[in-house]
A protein has these predicted regions:
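Bacterial Sec-dependent N-terminal signal peptides
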Residues: 1-24
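Domain-level marker for long, solvent-exposed, non-transmembrane regions
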Residues: 18-165
Length: 165
């Protein structure tokens, strides 16, 4: 009987800890992107786009890293809305592309995305306390030209003329 109680207690502990591990590893793409006037910065280069990305999380440092990943995700799959005199930026690919090339994008968003993005206001981020944690906003600059080139070279993004053949 004692062995049975010990076994049941051990199994409950195992299930509880397994759920905690799985929850920590899952990171969803919960973010907002807004296009803002650049002010004094030079943003006339068509190869780059500068915008604000807001992500949600529990720790500020972790959420900052998530902001960078979400910014690249936003450019690739959602695009940017127009704001003021700045026009909208269309997404590089459709939202179904992520599920079609799931393995590629899971690997890409582990670290490869970092070479296409930089913070324009390092250390100067917006942090808002919310009911479920923190909302962290960072102004970022994404190199769209290099990102498109990488996706084309890897066979993920197709040229219009390739699609017509």
């Amino acid at each position: 009987m004692k062995v049975l109680r010990f076994f049941i207690a051990f199994m409950r502990l195992g299930l509880i800890s397994a759920q905690g591990i799985a929850k920590d590893k899952f990171i969803d793409y919960n973010y907002e992107v807004t296009r803002e006037e650049c002010g004094s910065c030079k943003c006339s280069d068509p190869n780059y786009v500068i915008f604000m990305v807001y992500s949600y999380g529990k720790k500020e440092a972790t959420t900052t890293d998530i902001c960078l990943r979400n910014a690249v995700h936003g450019i690739m799959f959602k695009g940017l809305p127009a704001s003021g005199q700045l026009g909208a930026v269309s997404a590089l690919m459709g939202s179904t592309s992520y599920s079609e090339h799931n393995e590629y994008f899971n690997e890409f968003f582990k670290s490869a995305y970092k070479q296409y993005i930089s913070e324009t206001n390092k250390g100067n981020q917006t942090v808002i306390k919310c009911a479920k944690g923190l909302k962290v906003g960072i102004k970022v600059k994404v190199n769209i030209k290099l990102l498109k080139q990488r996706l084309k070279n890897d066979g993920i993004l197709k040229d219009f003329k390739d699609m017509m053949m």
